[in-house]
Amino acid sequence: EFCGDCDFLADPTGWKTHDSQGNCYESDILILATANRLTTSSETAWLPLQTIRGQTTHMAATELLGNLRTAFCHEGYLPPPRLGIHCLGATYGPQDTNLDERSTDHVTNLTKLATALPSVKFPTATADLSGHVALRCTTTDYLPVVGPVPNKAAFNACYADLQAQKTRFIDQECPVFPGVFVLAGLGSRGLT
């Protein structure tokens, strides 16, 4: 169950967390799959996650592009229309968390598409366009974070000498919170 922004606490029977309404949830296993909201929890804020804003543009299918049967990928993407509408995009705004739809982002999406398909006419006015804004959660190396959640204090103590000896053989298991797992950093490859 989604609890919103919350921290989790060790309990003799497992883990406890409270949602924003004060409801308490207890479990022996905790799976954290809350994308960029992991940066608000004290136990996971140190993980190498970043927020990237993206906006798609919804455009009426043209006579030419209405027959598109496969996705066209370029610096953006243009899939076949659904119910007469193309959903193209998307913008890429690191550290931008504003969820307001922007006409400038529609212009960016259309410009990328017009550059990739110069012989096709696209709308130049953005007033009739709509779109969708969402926040992606990525990692600094763009590989997802999957598995047990490391215990930061124990992790830093265990691997402190790696700062000075980067090639040192690691002969210890990573100290983790038992029963707490994470799935994050999927970026644009997330499941919705």
Residue map of PLM features:
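Short strand-connecting beta-turns/loops that link adjacent beta-strands
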Residues: 10-13, 83-84, 151
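A structural signal for short hydrophobic beta-strand segments in well-ordered beta-sheet cores
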Residues: 6-8, 77-80, 146
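Central helical "cap/lid" subdomain
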Residues: 18-72, 99-106, 119-124
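C-terminal catalytic lobe of FAD-dependent flavoproteins
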Residues: 122-192
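Hydrophobic/aromatic beta-strand patches that form the interior of the parallel beta-sheet core
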Residues: 1, 31, 181-183
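Conserved FAD/dinucleotide-binding core of flavoprotein oxidoreductases
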Residues: 81-129
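Conserved FAD-binding catalytic core of PHBH/FMO-like flavoproteins
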Residues: 62-89
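A conserved short coil-to-beta-strand element within the FAD-binding core of flavoproteins
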Residues: 1-16
